[in-house]
Curated annotation (Swiss-Prot):
The active site is at residue 141. This is Glyceraldehyde-3-phosphate dehydrogenase. It is found in: Cytoplasm. Its EC number is 1.2.1.59. D-glyceraldehyde 3-phosphate binds at residues 140-142, 195-196. It comes from the Archaea. Belongs to the glyceraldehyde-3-phosphate dehydrogenase family. It catalyses: D-glyceraldehyde 3-phosphate + phosphate + NADP(+) = (2R)-3-phospho-glyceroyl phosphate + NADPH + H(+); D-glyceraldehyde 3-phosphate + phosphate + NAD(+) = (2R)-3-phospho-glyceroyl phosphate + NADH + H(+). Disulfide bonds: none annotated.
Length: 340
């Protein structure tokens, strides 16, 4: 049983905490918050030991009547690994100023740059490369989703060229500061977007073979990808079969009512998923087509949750708990109640 510390109990951190708590080979020894908000109070109510991420703010929790066990410095030495859930750029600072200082292994999230850690993690592609490493970046929700679909395609044909248009959600549901509300925004306006190089950080063999562009649209539910991949040769049946065999990919039919991201989220609600999380990505079966060996398909990504099981697998890889990535994936999925 390994000890996991969650530094930053926010959108990602609280989900990773719940996922780790469901595993039988790891436990959450504590979570941190920078301020005494409702998430901090709920963490304590759920049974997590709460620590102040910033020592100077410990008194704020006490004044708010939220029990704290101490500060980050009081618990970090007990951790075998830290999962950093801090906002963009803060993760890198934590890595340099906290985790390396204390000599503790750490996972930073996809908001940081590839060069900030020893490698970039995806359960299907880079598990072995990250095995036993000390500092790893868990790639973003979009990159995670693309890595899964590229894995499926690559399992039946060589990828010659990949072109992806990303239609990104404007903000998470709890975000009142980000937009747009009434616009479509090229983000970035230049091509390629950062997503292609980010995929290459996980799949080096796609260097020079992947091109991405991205726009932001006024929705909060999910991202969507329109994928076009030139291959060495395949057909629709092979791709459908490959998607069915690839972990954490669901193939859904518009003919059964899955005609929008709203319906996919409703499906997650009906499954009883906490926070309506869909850790699996969803590919519309009707969108899958192959013309002259070029694969076309559309997929939806729940931006708050598809990276969560990857964090659990990354813990196992870095702490050398399981050498077989597929066994770790299966173990994680079963504990979290994933469909596949």
């Amino acid at each position: 049983m390994v000890n996991v510390l969650i530094n930053g109990y926010g959108s990602i951190g609280k989900r990773v905490a719940d996922a780790v708590a469901k595993q039988d080979d790891m436990k959450v020894i504590g979570v941190t918050k920078t301020k005494p908000d409702f998430e901090a109070r709920m963490a304590v109510e759920k049974g997590y030991k709460l620590f102040a991420a910033i020592p100077e703010r410990k008194h704020l929790f006490e004044e708010a009547g939220i029990p704290v066990e101490g500060t980050l410095d009081d618990i970090i030495e007990d951790a075998d690994i830290v999962v950093d859930g801090a906002p963009k750029k803060i993760g890198k600072a934590n890595l340099e100023n906290v985790y390396k200082k204390h000599g503790v292994k750490a996972i930073i999230q996809g908001g940081e740059k590839a060069g900030d850690a020893q490698d970039s993690f995806n359960s299907l592609w880079s598990y072995n490369r990250c095995y036993g490493k000390d500092y790893i970046r868990l790639v973003s929700c979009n990159t995670t989703g693309l890595c899964r679909s590229m894995y499926a395609i690559n399992s039946v044909a060589d990828i010659l060229k990949a072109r992806i248009v990303l239609i990104r959600r404007a903000a998470d549901p709890n975000d009142v500061k980000t937009g747009p509300v009434n616009a479509i925004v090229p983000n970035p306006v230049s091509v390629p977007s950062h997503h292609g190089p980010d995929v290459v950080s996980v799949i080096p063999e796609l260097d020079g073979k992947i091109m991405t562009s991205a726009v932001i649209v006024p929705t909060t539910l999910m991202h969507m990808h329109s994928i076009m991949v030139e291959t060495s040769g395949t057909n629709r049946d092979e791709i459908i079969d490959a998607l069915a065999k690839t972990p954490r990919i669901l193939t859904l039919k518009a003919s059964e009512g899955f005609d929008s991201t709203a319906k996919i989220i409703e499906y997650a609600r009906d499954l009883g998923r906490s926070r309506y999380d869909l850790n699996e990505i969803a590919v519309w079966e009707e969108s899958v087509n192959v013309v002259d060996n070029e694969v076309y398909m559309m997929q939806a990504i729940h931006q708050e949750s598809d990276v969560i099981p990857e964090n659990v697998d990354c813990i196992r890889a870095m702490l050398e708990m399981e050498s077989d990535n597929l066994k770790s994936i299966e173990k994680t999925n079963k504990a979290m109640g994933l469909i596949k």
